[in-house]
Amino acid sequence: MEPRGGTELQFEYLRKHVDPKLLDQVQITTSVPEKIPLHPTKLNILWEKNSYDQPNLAPWFKDKSNHHKYDWYVFNSNWSYEKFRMAFDIPTEKCVVIKNGVENINPIQSPYVKGQPIKIIHQCTPWRGLSVLLGAMQLVKNPLISLDVYSSTEIYGKAFHEQNDKHYQALYEQARQLPNVNYIGYKPNEYIKEHLKDYRLFVYPSIWEETFCISALEAMAAGLYCVVTNYGALFETCSEFPMYIPYSNDYKSLAQKFAQGIEVAAKALEAPGIQGHLDMQKQFVNRFYNWNIKGTSWTRFLQGAINAK
């Protein structure tokens, strides 16, 4: 299996929504500088999705003599751009922010009715906060609430999975043993998008500085109420719509706060104004993050960059 994480999926959308003749005039490298050789004649663009502190890119950026090698740097959030700017003094005149997008999300069809089951989805990789979420679920008392976990290393391909998945087996087993948790494991993005409508909450106690969060954005587009930390670029991605739990590196305390947040979010589903809130959330995502719009942003950027060369 080849990797199909957020980076790969966004590149698929880029190819779908931007004229291939335009893309053929540039070479776009994702995240890790010079993982493919610089092209001698085309515009070289680094589409940066990783965090500024990652060891596979930080040394390259620290050497300022490298900065001229790319014609443009594209960041997927202003948060990430600011981190790179402050950490490495990158040439700002060669930088642009074009955020990620979503496509073909099936929304929830009917408002929540009191007494119905409340299913939570969590489809983030295991090192980003699954341990905190499982700790929280042990404290959740509402019998209507259950969690489906799709967390796996398989999303990053066979080689990564075989090398790293063993480190998380104990965590998966813990999920299997909890009565209010169903461990499902990896499902492709198409499956996740098709089944988001079966859930009411997306809960992500992120302990990883996301440069964006496609999982959260897809959940928002489907009309799920989201409970997340305010860590990294999550606040920029999700705007005012989720319930934010302040990040803490005391993970036991964070789990306790998320347990309370889950209970409150479940109760909020019964509130008279919640449907209007979730409808506005869906409209927000579709207005600003639809890939038809992102495709236009990329097209304009690439045309301008090529013309200015």
Question: Which stretches of residues belong to each language-model region?
Answer:
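Acidic anion/phosphate-binding donor-loop and adjacent secondary structure
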Residues: N56-L57, R85-M86, E93, K99-P117
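Short hydrophobic beta-strand element within catalytic cores of glycosyltransferases
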Residues: Y225-V228
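A short, active-site helix/loop in glycosyltransferases that binds the activated sugar's phosphate group
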Residues: D71-K94
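N-terminal pre-catalytic "stem/leader" segment of glycosyltransferase-like enzymes
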Residues: M1-L38
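Conserved donor-binding/catalytic core segment of Leloir-type glycosyltransferases
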Residues: Y112-G129, L134-M137, D148
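A charged, aromatic-enriched C-terminal amphipathic alpha-helix characteristic of glycosyltransferases
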Residues: R4-L9, N249, S253, E270-I306
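Nucleotide-activated donor-binding/catalytic signature segment of Leloir-type glycosyltransferases, i.e.
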Residues: H161-K187
